């Protein structure tokens, strides 16, 4: 479940209407795809979750696992704040400690600025969810 949530958050940053929506690891291996309807698939195209336009994040069985609010606040399924996504791509936990960064070019970095992945065709906010649901 932890791995699913991590990947789901990472994928959630994808734009639902982009044509090439993918998540890659630091070595550029594809680890996930996001379809135009918000379905999230792993590298083997198995459905692992869903992201809805309203910010609701669900697992493969449509159980809600979290929420991305319009102001960048991230909540778990129990509506507890687990973090914040800043407009500049800085990702913070609920205590405002920096967890990582999502750059405008799609590079995803940890708190020490090490590259941990790449996103293509995915909104920064959705990619940042990786830090909260892993």
Positions of predicted regions on the chain:
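Long terminal segments
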Residues: 2-47, 53-55, 61-64, 70-72, ...
């Amino acid at each position: 479940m932890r791995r699913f949530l991590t990947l789901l958050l990472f994928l959630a940053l994808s734009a639902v209407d982009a044509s090439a929506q993918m998540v890659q690891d630091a070595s550029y291996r594809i680890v996930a795809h996001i379809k135009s309807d918000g379905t999230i698939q792993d590298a083997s195209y198995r459905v692992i979750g869903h992201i809805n336009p309203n910010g609701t994040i669900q697992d493969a069985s449509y159980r809600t696992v979290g929420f991305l609010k319009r102001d960048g606040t991230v909540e778990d399924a129990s509506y507890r704040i687990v973090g914040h996504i800043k407009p500049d791509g800085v990702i913070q936990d609920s205590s405002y400690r920096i967890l990582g960064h999502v750059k405008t070019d799609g590079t995803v970095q940890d708190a020490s600025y090490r590259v941990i992945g790449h996103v293509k065709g995915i909104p920064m906010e959705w990619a940042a969810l990786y830090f909260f649901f892993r």
